[in-house]
Amino acid sequence: MVPGARGGGALARAAGRGLLALLLAVSAPLRLQAEELGDGCGHLVTYQDSGTMTSKNYPGTYPNHTVCEKTITVPKGKRLILRLGDLDIESQTCASDYLLFTSSSDQYGPYCGSMTVPKELLLNTSEVTVRFESGSHISGRGFLLTYASSDHPDLITCLERASHYLKTEYSKFCPAGCRDVAGDISGNMVDGYRDTSLLCKAAIHAGIIADELGGQISVLQRKGISRYEGILANGVLSRDGSLSDKRFLFTSNGCSRSLSFEPDGQIRASSSWQSVNESGDQVHWSPGQARLQDQGPSWASGDSSNNHKPREWLEIDLGEKKKITGIRTTGSTQSNFNFYVKSFVMNFKNNNSKWKTYKGIVNNEEKVFQGNSNFRDPVQNNFIPPIVARYVRVVPQTWHQRIALKVELIGCQITQGNDSLVWRKTSQSTSVSTKKEDETITRPIPSEETSTGINITTVAIPLVLLVVLVFAGMGIFAAFRKKKKKGSPYGSAEAQKTDCWKQIKYPFARHQSAEFTISYDNEKEMTQKLDLITSDMADYQQPLMIGTGTVTRKGSTFRPMDTDAEEAGVSTDAGGHYDCPQRAGRHEYALPLAPPEPEYATPIVERHVLRAHTFSAQSGYRVPGPQPGHKHSLSSGGFSPVAGVGAQDGDYQRPHSAQPADRGYDRPKAVSALATESGHPDSQKPPTHPGTSDSYSAPRDCLTPLNQTAMTALL
């Protein structure tokens, strides 16, 4: 072979190898870029109107030469709210490393480096494309983004902590997807959480919201405690915490009480295990020992293999349909038996129905709950939405060594009016089909105990009863007041405003008394003077007098002696001593009283003195006036009053002026005889004729002396 030919072939082979290397060098970046397109996205959870998105490896350093591009949406007609919880991109020029938001009409960004980035963006659209691109860099966490619709202006990011807020009470909206975001929490749902804990992550731990759904939270900030105990709940591990100045708690719907059930008859299991202790005695791990509050070993299944053909289960009968919002579980609780269930699913049913499996609200798949990680510590899982059923089964999926469970159900009774405790979907787009019998119902089962709206009856009946009671009370009060007013002895209020004295209505009438009335002169401490009166008490009894003002006086039990009006011919039926306007239907005004007198009977002698100085001789008759130097003798056997000053011939003088026939008493028939005897000294003691008792009545205001027989009988 010619040497030149051999050299040409070698050159051709070398050129071919170089061309192949060049092609590989050119195609490698293209292939790498194709593989990494969209591979720069990290944590991503989206729901109907909220979600969370991060760069890859967040909060670690994001990889080189990656691209993350996603489109996020909220319901049409709503505006989109974006909040950047964290943005750390190394590039300063945004040439190869940046974060960009693009909508159909606007562009927001790019953002990178140390640029001032708004914490919140309110977009005029319901859809936006998020693009994150990275080049060659050394450090940088990337970004954390949360979003929600404009229905939730109080949106916060997954990185918000309670220490960021000063208010003692506030409400915020947590987006979906905060459970797996890096960050610690300390505390539990009973004692509260340390104020350095992430708010949304703590809300998931407490069972207030579901991670895949997000939701509204209400926070109460309180004084801190010395130690915070951490537990595992709803897939979130809470750590033990130290003393802090403040802590926070969540307000719940009140349906978080322990549901009681009896160990005998209300708990069943697919099988149970019997062990032998060190002393050779058998230990029965029966279903009745599955209550969390009971001491001793738990329930354990009879088969310890990991390949159970029929599923093992623990069934609880609550006695009636109840709302179940959560479950607490532990393992064997025995240190020498390290048994516990690592994961499980829930089945439930009601009377005469088939068993249903609890499924997730988003993907409509059988929901597997995270169980215990040791035999001792309790773990809590919440059902969002709650289970409404009478029978519940815990079906273990994975376990350690042997299935062993202690269980406590959390929930409340179903009553009319607690419809607010029922979780509702925010949209119909994620409704779950329930046509098949073996599918779960992700909302409470409609029943006679669970109302689907505001129960009008529970509102209307109390209102009607309240109105009836109010009207009944008003009627009773009006009737009582009317009766009291009608039976009042004081007349109407209108009558009391006339500035006149009114006669009080007596509730009863006194009967005539034939007894003697005795009065005493207490003021002058004189010897007892006896004034014997036999008359109708109704004529002498004087009504109480009440003025229209604040002054109230009590009158004497004897009628006043001022009869000027009578002597003047004025009728007592027409008016009193006061010119007071009369109204139709009104009673006669009472006569005015003399100067105030004591409540008991006024002494007769004092009244005589008053009459003697008050009434003139023209009044028609005179009354006797006692002399200071004379006394009535009660021991002499007679009664001889001495003539008073101003008397002509005797103690009594008959009326001189003739009065009309319609006087208050009958006229004497034997006037001439009395007139003849008036000049005789013996006229001091007027004679009493038996025959005149029928034709003559003594004036009401005159005194009738007693005869010797009456005085003797009295003494």
Swiss-Prot record:
GO CC terms of this entry: plasma membrane
Keyword Lipid biosynthesis attributed: no
Lineage: superkingdom: Eukaryota
Membrane topology field: Single-pass type I membrane protein
Gene Ontology molecular function terms on file: signaling receptor activity
Ranges that cross the membrane: 460-480
Residue ranges of every copy of the LCCL domain listed in the record: 152-248
SUPFAM superfamilies, sorted: Galactose-binding domain-like, LCCL domain, Spermadhesin, CUB domain
Pfam families documented for this protein: CUB (PF00431), F5_F8_type_C (PF00754), LCCL (PF03815)
Record domain F5/8 type C: where: 248-412
Subcellular localization(s) per the UniProt record: Membrane
Extracellular face of the membrane: 35-459
Protein name in the entry: Discoidin, CUB and LCCL domain-containing protein 1
Organism for this UniProt entry: Homo sapiens
